């Protein structure tokens, strides 16, 4: 924090006053400006520190002209004609080591206060790394950065480093399978590593809806409210699923307002930008636009190759670079299918005790190449085909039977729903008798592992995939 007795502080306050009066500076840009720390003047240059590259980029691009105009409005005695930006990540951490300044001294946005969990037997335990529902596999260290997601990644890092300081809410949108959920979990993990005791909760919109319905049915509204409002960071996935659910939207509206009013960070993902979420009231859509909106797009070839290479390294798979490149040219739709293809290829090689070469990859890929984007497989078709293949009924797959035959068939159906559709884990769980999303995660992981170990499982999954896609192409069961 700058010293108010330093002449630089007085200069910066005059610059801030000019920027406040500038119509070009939107509330979103004010958020970026609030992260700036003036550090001194040397040979006519005002040196400014910011916590991350994203903020530096915004100052040097979108805010550059208004900032130069503000500097130009200073009297000659200030001795300032230009500015320079220095990135100092310690600024973000310092923000939490001090008390928020009075409103008069902090003109744009108040620094959030991270509080330790309190012992209150009437409330649910505050989220920590253990109960924040974060997936340990999804961190920034496992996220592959490319041109399609670079800005979204930078924004996510900035939010984790300085929650509620500038981009609140952070709204990330894009098609399924492009890394939005990964970024949500990574924000949570990174924030917890920076600020021990910070309260983080991840939730899908389906889980939020179910919790809300259960709280009404069980007359436990206060517990529902504390579960989602007593957080420093709330990460909510696939907000589009709240469209048309008026009561749940109302609950989220009040949750959002409570968190935002108390300078707590909200991060939201969606498959559409706010203006296209027509199933929400205008007041909710406008709140989505209060902070920073960014998108993730389908990865380019170089990024797809890098994703495959990182996945191969994490799974300790030996795959030549030319094979990774070939797979990356053939699978272009999303990251989930790209990684699933790699698992299929290496599982086939392991079962047949053969090296991963071009001929093998071509054999495996012939039944895996994605259908046209408009030719979407319905989950009910997957379930029907799986039931017929294993000579079971659909009710068997939906039901509670734990016999090995039924359980394996159910897990394969869940795996295929995850691989061949864009449904989220909670949505797949709902299809199978309202099972929890963790059950779907377990099924996906188990079938992935069994495919490497048992030829029978690999053959069953491969044959079912082929049948489902052929049926979809030619319309016959």
From Swiss-Prot:
Which segments carry the region annotation Domain II?
A: 87-132
Q: Has UniProt tagged this entry with the keyword DNA repair?
A: no
The UniProt entry's coiled-coil ranges are none
An annotated Gene Ontology molecular function: ATP binding
CDD domains attached to this UniProt entry:
AAA, Bac_DnaA_C
Q: Which UniProt keywords apply?
A: ATP-binding, Cytoplasm, DNA replication, DNA-binding, Lipid-binding, Nucleotide-binding
Disulfide bond positions: none
User: Looking at the record, which segments are called Domain III, AAA+ region?
Assistant: 133-349
Q: Where in the cell is it found?
A: Cytoplasm
UniProt-annotated stretches for the region Disordered: 112-131
Q: Which parts of this chain are annotated as the region Domain I, interacts with DnaA modulators?
A: 1-87
Domain IV, binds dsDNA, as annotated region: 350-477
InterPro entries hit by this protein: AAA+_ATPase (IPR003593), Chromosome_initiator_DnaA (IPR001957), Chromosome_initiator_DnaA-like (IPR020591), Chromosome_initiator_DnaA_CS (IPR018312), DnaA_C (IPR013159), DnaA_dom (IPR013317), P-loop_NTPase (IPR027417), Trp_repressor/repl_initiator (IPR010921)
User: Where does this protein hold ATP?
Assistant: 177, 179-181
Q: Which GO terms describe its cellular component?
A: cytoplasm; plasma membrane
Q: What does this protein do?
A: Plays an essential role in the initiation and regulation of chromosomal replication. ATP-DnaA binds to the origin of replication (oriC) to initiate formation of the DNA replication initiation complex once per cell cycle. Binds the DnaA box (a 9 base pair repeat at the origin) and separates the double-stranded (ds)DNA. Forms a right-handed helical filament on oriC DNA; dsDNA binds to the exterior of the filament while single-stranded (ss)DNA is stabiized in the filament's interior.
Mind telling me which HAMAP family this protein's record contains? DnaA_bact (MF_00377)
Identify its protein family.
Belongs to the DnaA family.
| Description of its domains | Domain I is involved in oligomerization and binding regulators, domain II is flexibile and of varying length in different bacteria, domain III forms the AAA+ region, while domain IV binds dsDNA.
* Assembly, per entry: Oligomerizes as a right-handed, spiral filament on DNA at oriC.
Any idea what this protein is called? Chromosomal replication initiator protein DnaA
Identify the coding gene: dnaA
């Amino acid at each position: 924090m700058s010293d108010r007795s330093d002449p630089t502080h007085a200069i910066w306050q005059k610059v801030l006053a000019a920027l406040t009066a500038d119509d070009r500076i939107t509330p979103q840009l004010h958020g970026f400006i609030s992260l700036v720390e003036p550090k001194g003047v040397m040979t006519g240059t005002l040196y400014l520190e910011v916590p991350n590259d994203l903020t530096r980029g915004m100052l040097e691009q979108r805010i550059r002209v208004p900032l130069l105009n503000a500097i130009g409005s200073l009297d000659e005695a200030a001795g300032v004609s230009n500015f320079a930006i220095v990135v100092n990540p310690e600024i973000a951490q310092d923000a939490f080591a001090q008390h928020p300044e009075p409103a008069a001294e902090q003109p744009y946005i108040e620094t959030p206060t991270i509080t330790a969990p309190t012992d209150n037997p009437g409330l649910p335990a505050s989220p920590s790394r253990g109960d924040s529902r974060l997936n340990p596999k999804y961190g920034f260290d496992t996220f592959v950065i490319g041109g399609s997601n670079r800005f979204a990644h930078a924004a996510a890092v900035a939010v984790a480093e300085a929650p509620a300081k500038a981009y609140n809410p952070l709204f990330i949108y894009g098609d399924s399978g492009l890394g939005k959920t990964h970024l949500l979990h990574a924000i949570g993990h990174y924030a917890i590593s920076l600020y021990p005791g910070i309260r983080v909760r991840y939730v899908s919109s389906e889980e939020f809806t179910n919790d809300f319905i259960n709280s009404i049915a069980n007359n436990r509204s206060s517990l529902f409210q504390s579960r989602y409002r007593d957080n420093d960071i709330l990460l909510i996935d696939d907000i589009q699923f709240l469209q048309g659910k008026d009561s749940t939207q109302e609950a989220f509206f009040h949750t959002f307002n409570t968190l935002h009013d108390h300078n707590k960070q909200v991060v939201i993902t969606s498959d559409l930008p706010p203006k296209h979420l027509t199933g929400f009231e205008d007041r909710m859509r406008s709140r989505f636009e209060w902070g920073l909106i960014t998108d993730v797009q389908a990865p380019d070839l170089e990024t797809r190759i890098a994703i495959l290479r990182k996945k191969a390294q994490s799974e300790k798979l030996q795959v030549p670079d030319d094979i990774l490149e070939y797979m990356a040219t053939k699978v272009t739709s999303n990251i989930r299918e790209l990684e699933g293809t790699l698992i299929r290829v290496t599982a086939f090689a392991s079962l047949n005790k053969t090296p991963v070469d071009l001929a093998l990859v071509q054999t495996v890929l012939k039944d895996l190449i994605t259908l046209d984007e408009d030719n979407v497989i319905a989950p009910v078709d997957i379930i029907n085909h799986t039931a017929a293949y294993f000579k079971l009924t659909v009710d068997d797959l939906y039901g509670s039977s734990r016999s090995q035959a039924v359980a394996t068939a159910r897990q394969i159906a869940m795996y295929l729903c995850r691989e061949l559709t864009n449904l989220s884990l909670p949505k797949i769980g709902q299809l199978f008798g309202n099972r929890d999303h963790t059950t779907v995660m377990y099924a996906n992981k188990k079938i992935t592992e069994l495919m490497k170990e048992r030829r029978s499982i690999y053959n069953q999954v491969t044959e079912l995939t082929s049948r489902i896609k052929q049926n979809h192409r030619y319309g016959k069961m």
